[in-house]
């Protein structure tokens, strides 16, 4: 994305990590989190999405992420373009995608084969690139 001349800024939620001093240093992924951490993390994500012109999602087909699906829906509800970059570590399996994502996104760039296209994709106009070769659920 940094090499793409049509990209001015990238918001990556993991660069906006929140810490709650009351939690201590050993909080791990999937552990119960404080209300402060949950509220601040959620609001930072919503703020980033609200200020974005479009969204690009690296979408792990092997371990689906409800948060990504929510964020994609949030952007589409605001009529903002969404580019999904699906990838898998199991290329031998027939890929399947949920209908609401496969028809809701503006463009698909297959992460396993087309990742280099992110360098030249026109994010100013976000041309449509329909998903092909996937089953639908």
Predicted regions and their residues:
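Conserved catalytic or regulatory cores that recognize and/or transform ribose-phosphate-containing ligands
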Residues: 1-137
């Amino acid at each position: 994305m940094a090499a793409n001349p049509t990209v001015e800024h990238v918001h990556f939620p993991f660069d906006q990590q929140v810490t709650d001093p009351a939690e201590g240093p050993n909080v791990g992924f999937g552990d119960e989190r404080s209300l402060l951490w949950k509220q601040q993390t959620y609001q930072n994500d919503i703020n980033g999405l609200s200020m974005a012109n479009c969204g690009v999602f690296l979408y792990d087909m092997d371990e689906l992420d409800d948060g990504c699906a929510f964020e994609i829906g949030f952007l589409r509800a605001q009529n903002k373009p969404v580019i999904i970059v699906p990838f898998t570590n199991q290329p031998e399996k027939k890929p399947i995608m949920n209908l609401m994502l496969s028809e809701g996104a503006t463009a698909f760039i297959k992460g396993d084969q087309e990742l280099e296209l992110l360098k030249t994709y026109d994010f100013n106009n976000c041309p449509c690139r329909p998903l092909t070769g996937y089953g639908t659920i």
